[in-house]
Amino acid sequence: MSQKELWYETLHANFGQYFSVENVLYREKTEHQDLVIFENPELGRVMALDGVVQTTERDEFIYHEMMTHVPLLAHGQAKKVLIIGGGDGAMLREVSRHKNIEQITMVEIDAGVVEFCRQYLPNHSAGAYDDPRFKLVIDDGVNFVNQTTEKFDVIISDCTDPIGPGESLFTSVFYEGCARSLNEGGIFVAQNGVCFLQQDEAVNSHNKLSHYFSDVSFYQAAIPTYYGGIMTFAWATQNPALRQLDLATLQNRFAQAGLACRYYNPAIHVGSFALPQYLLDALTTIPKVIGLDSSE
């Protein structure tokens, strides 16, 4: 191990994780972020932005299947999907597996990320960038949702942590724009961190989203790369019934969609909305947490 280069993640100040580096495939500071892609013997190709791992070939399927199939199958009739972020292409890959969807718009702030990932993480997108339903917009996500006149059935915020370029995707002005950009019966979901270590993120998101959506909650999955426990995904709609679909309904929709997944299944879908008590307590007993710009 001592003879190998080690790459250390810097998300948390007092502890973290390291990766052995077999080969650095790409390293560059783009217009918005410091990007590196390297190979690890256990996880395959790994992409990190600003010192924080974003995705690995080994376990990305868990994150992307849960971020897409949960809202899309809960909706049941989605035709237009908006992805905020998602430059590695895996979110697009999973959304494009739903043949009933007519339009997929992806808004990515950094064109460099898209270019690098198409070259160095081709398995993530798996050709999805060539889908005729796909449209790429290079823009800030906050600006897009507050300027567009389009309406979407599902909005997926594949945001980084609330630092650097990703910080604006945790603000009220972004959530308000997303609520306005959804069709009736639409669903908004977003990456919301590992709640055991980043509980404030979930509490702040819940507080802000509740101003614009009548049903706000979280669902979860365990993703090895994102250490510290379960990862939470924000869920926001105007229709509580979409979060409470029975197993039989989801099984029927899953079968009709013809999906073959490695992590997602209808039972996982139902169970993912069961949250640990410490998070439920935080959401009900902490009225407001300072730290993520709750005023904007």
UniProtKB/Swiss-Prot annotation:
Query: Sorted alphabetically, which PROSITE patterns does this protein's record hold?
Result: PABS_1, PABS_2
Q: Which residues bind S-methyl-5'-thioadenosine?
A: 33, 108, 140-141, 165
InterPro entries noted in UniProt: PABS, PABS_CS, SAM-dependent_MTases_sf, Spermi_synthase, Spermidine_synt_N, Spermidine_synt_N_sf
Q: Which domain of life is it from?
A: Bacteria
Keyword Lipid biosynthesis in record: no
Listed CDD domains: AdoMet_MTases
- EC number(s) on file: 2.5.1.16
Q: Name one GO cellular component term.
A: cytosol
Domain PABS: where?
5-238
Q: Which reaction does it catalyse?
A: S-adenosyl 3-(methylsulfanyl)propylamine + putrescine = S-methyl-5'-thioadenosine + spermidine + H(+)
**What is this protein identified as?**
Polyamine aminopropyltransferase
Q: Which organism does this record belong to?
A: Yersinia pseudotuberculosis serotype O:3 (strain YPIII)
Lineage summary = Bacteria, Pseudomonadati, Pseudomonadota, Gammaproteobacteria, Enterobacterales
This protein's encoding gene: speE
